[in-house]
């Protein structure tokens, strides 16, 4: 019999909301955040995408770190007891995908830890299984909690298709 896991807190940063309550309300209202991007398509027309409106114009890994970091900070606000004792499972795009915005997952993990202002947990890890990453992460989180490897596990996913190589 496998042990159950509880969701203690959530955080979200999306094209329609920079926190979970805003993003969920926008999605319930069927907002999607799609608009013209700064990328030109083959016909010379602006491509449509759903960029996240961050306060600064960060790009690449720095942008990914701030997207994930903001969602993680939001989750820690709801569960402050987890701060400093949470293993992070970071879900990223598969390593061979053209335009993947993250070149070095371990470096991204460290950058996120700096933004969140916590030491990286020894059991933190990266999963690169594309759309299946969330399912893989849930199973790994369940195992980590049931074995006592970590009292808390946070699963975060960050990605973008709005990169020159992806387009």
Regions found by a protein language model. Name each.
Residues 135-138, 152-153:
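Active-site histidine-anchored catalytic micro-motif
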Residues 151-153, 157-167:
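Acyl-CoA/ACP chain-elongation machinery
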Residues 1-132, 136, 143-147, 158, ...:
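Conserved "HGTGT" condensation-loop signature of ketosynthase/thiolase-family condensing enzymes
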């Amino acid at each position: 019999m496998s042990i159950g896991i509880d969701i203690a807190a959530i955080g979200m940063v999306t094209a329609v909301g920079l926190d979970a309550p805003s993003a969920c309300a926008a999605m319930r209202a069927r907002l999607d955040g799609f608009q013209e991007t700064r990328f030109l398509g083959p016909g010379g027309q602006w491509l449509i995408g759903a960029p996240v409106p961050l306060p600064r114009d960060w790009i690449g890994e720095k942008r990914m770190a701030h997207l994930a970091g903001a969602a993680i900070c939001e989750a820690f606000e709801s569960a402050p007891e987890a701060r400093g004792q949470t293993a992070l499972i970071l879900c990223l795009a598969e390593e061979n995908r053209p335009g993947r915005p993250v070149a070095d997952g371990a470096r991204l993990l460290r950058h996120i830890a700096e933004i969140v202002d916590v030491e990286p947990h020894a059991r933190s890890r990266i999963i690169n299984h594309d759309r299946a990453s969330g399912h893989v992460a849930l199973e790994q989180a369940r195992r980590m909690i049931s074995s006592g490897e970590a009292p808390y596990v946070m699963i975060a996913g960050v990605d973008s298709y709005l990169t020159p190589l992806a387009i």
